[in-house]
């Protein structure tokens, strides 16, 4: 699968297994989502450009490197994407955070937008879209198209679990967008939930039904 990156790090795989467990409670689920997002964020940001600078240490002068080039923006898809934000901000505390609110119509299964707030300089940033579950790919594709319409050229999608159908939809609609995930599951059920998946990520994050 081109432009799809599946992380097989032992810590990520262990924590994904705990996420899948139906007996994992809400507090533990939230913590795991945040931890996995931080671990994945380390890899997602691997290719950020660096520049050399000179700084003064307590002992003397040193040539070292800092991140340069485009600034990073994080855009969670509401509501489940919110669970991944803190983990990313632990790595990149200066990143700007936008929000896109989408829900899936229960009849048509198509995404419906109800909220959008992006950084004013979003077109100057590299954007990482956060969505724990890539199921049909409809919501992620719609969110990414909206971001592209704002002039953004460099976009990545970070999710915890992806279904093959969602990956195929993304590759059809946005072949230029890299997909970063911890696991790929084979199928969707009749309600467009990933199988075996982990259930409804939003409900498990926020203790709702």
Swiss-Prot record:
Instruction: Report any one BP term from Gene Ontology.
Output: uracil salvage
Q: What EC numbers are recorded for this enzyme?
A: 2.4.2.9
What keyword terms does UniProt attach to this protein? Allosteric enzyme, Glycosyltransferase, GTP-binding, Magnesium, Nucleotide-binding, Transferase
Cofactor note as given: Binds 1 Mg(2+) ion per subunit. The magnesium is bound as Mg-PRPP.
- What GO MF terms are annotated? GTP binding; magnesium ion binding; uracil phosphoribosyltransferase activity
Q: In which pathway does it act?
A: Pyrimidine metabolism; UMP biosynthesis via salvage pathway; UMP from uracil: step 1/1
InterPro entries per the UniProt record, alphabetical: PRibTrfase_dom (IPR000836), PRTase-like (IPR029057), Upp_B (IPR034332), UPRTase/APRTase (IPR050054), Ura_phspho_trans (IPR005765)
- Give the CDD domains listed for this entry: PRTases_typeI
Which residues does the record give as uracil binding sites? 194, 199-201
Q: Can you tell me which residues bind 5-phospho-alpha-D-ribose 1-diphosphate?
A: 79, 104, 131-139, 200
What this protein catalyses is: UMP + diphosphate = 5-phospho-alpha-D-ribose 1-diphosphate + uracil
The record's Pfam families line, in alphabetical order, gives: UPRTase
What HAMAP family does this protein's entry cite? Upp_B
Q: Which NCBIfam families match?
A: PRK00129.1, upp
Protein's job = Catalyzes the conversion of uracil and 5-phospho-alpha-D-ribose 1-diphosphate (PRPP) to UMP and diphosphate.
The protein in question is named Uracil phosphoribosyltransferase
